[in-house]
Amino acid sequence: MEEIQRYLQLDRSQQHDFLYPLIFQEYIYAFAHDRGFGRSILSENPGYDKKSSLLIVKRLITRMYQQNHFIGSTNDSNQNPFLGRNKNLYYQIISEGFAFIVEIPFSLRLISSREGKNKKIVKSQNLRSIHSIFPFLEDNFSHLNFVLDILIPYPVHVEVLVQTLRYWVKDASSLHLVRFFLNEYCNWNSLILPKKASFSCSKINQRLFLFLYNSHVCEYESIFVFLRNQSSHLLSTSSGVLLERIYFYGKIECLVNVFVKVKDFQANLWLVKEPCMHYVRYQRKSILASKGTFLLIKKWKCYLMTFWQWHFLLWFQPRRIYINQLSNHFLEFLGYLSNVRMNPAVVRSQILENSFLMNNSIKKFDTLVPISPLIASLAKAKFCNVLGHPISKPVRADLSDSNIIDRFGHICRNLSHYHSGSFKKKSLYRIKYILRLSCARTLARKHKSTVRAFLKRLGSDLLEEFLMSEEDVLSLTFPKASSTLRGGYKSRIWYLDIIYINDLANYK
């Protein structure tokens, strides 16, 4: 961000209030391309052999505002560079550039907040990991009783996102451009349903839409910032730039008259002291847990739903919010099934000559691998059938043996790595077995042989690569500490290098 500041050579107030002129600067699109993920979109379009230039952007914006834009016959579309396949490309150029530009005020706000504190903030990459939420849940959720399981709805209209952006970006021209762009050239249903999106929306506006959606989510989550008395349990250093992360909110010590300044609830909303309230979110899934009674959590549900609906136009349906008790209900979050169970323990005590036994029950937070949804994901990916029986992958039969083994091994290691925090490994071993047999069946199909004959001929060592357990990996990485760490393998391991959910574990 510092490089961008030096390159723009603009005052911070000018950057915040006048973003529209930056759309016509060529280096903006170079920055957007360099910060993008994967290959450039320009190299994926065979019909585009020129760099994005100021002239192209000016022509596109001018034609966007024309009354009869992009209306022509089929014959003209072959000659008009703004029709057909190139039209999608130019839309993508504009959306990438604008998504990069509109993030500037948020990045500057984050930088100014750091400078205002006049202290050095330690950057920790571990806070980016989605697995860092589970140690937090282990420490806090075992003492809680009820949880609100919330599925965040999408905004009802694209105008809601633009209106939210108005509070952050004061440039009317930029807001008008993004409103016109989204309304004219994108289907709102395609934006909120990526699986059904067309090329022009699914591939062009992912970054722009995620930015707008996350800004909207941060607005309605601001109520929790208003409620808390203490600082966050863990501070996400990247929350200011609105990237998709988990939000950590700490303990609320005194929660009295929380909505006293909110006009709609000033007369009738008074809450008793609630010593423990926690909120976490990942993508559309959010959890609000409390130590209070069922009546209190039910009031929270009513108050929050009403507040969000009237002030942020988030229309929650009753089936989107569940009130569950942690002791007898499994919570599905980030590809895990979590709950709080009572762990009995017998303690022998002795006082002088008398001894006696005491039975104690300790609450423990458990995380398990949901075997049925995971098998359904494997069946959808054609690794097995719906019953969990391994099948071959004909698509990969044309690859070399080593390539087939590497691909299956990569999938197996990723799943094992992601689900390493499971308390019981039996389900994980079954998944490894399915992938192992699927790889063997694929190799046997390629060589026109049976699985048993193939393994007998080549030996079982062929598949050991992707069957390596987490214990073996850590023992190779830390040979001196392998004996010390080996005792922890039987419980759970949380890896803080995982920043997104595994595709096979993302049950949708």
UniProtKB/Swiss-Prot annotation:
Family: Belongs to the intron maturase 2 family. MatK subfamily.
Keyword annotations: Chloroplast, mRNA processing, Plastid, RNA-binding, tRNA processing
Molecular function in Gene Ontology: RNA binding
Organism: Antirrhinum majus (Garden snapdragon)
Cellular compartments per GO CC: chloroplast
Ranges that cross the membrane: none
Record lineage: Eukaryota, Viridiplantae, Streptophyta, Embryophyta, Tracheophyta
Localisation per UniProt entry: Plastid, Chloroplast
GO biological process: mRNA processing; RNA splicing; tRNA processing
Protein name from the UniProt record: Maturase K
Biological function: Usually encoded in the trnK tRNA gene intron. Probably assists in splicing its own and other chloroplast group II introns.
Disulfide feature: none
InterPro entries from the UniProt entry: Domain_X, Maturase_MatK, Maturase_MatK_N
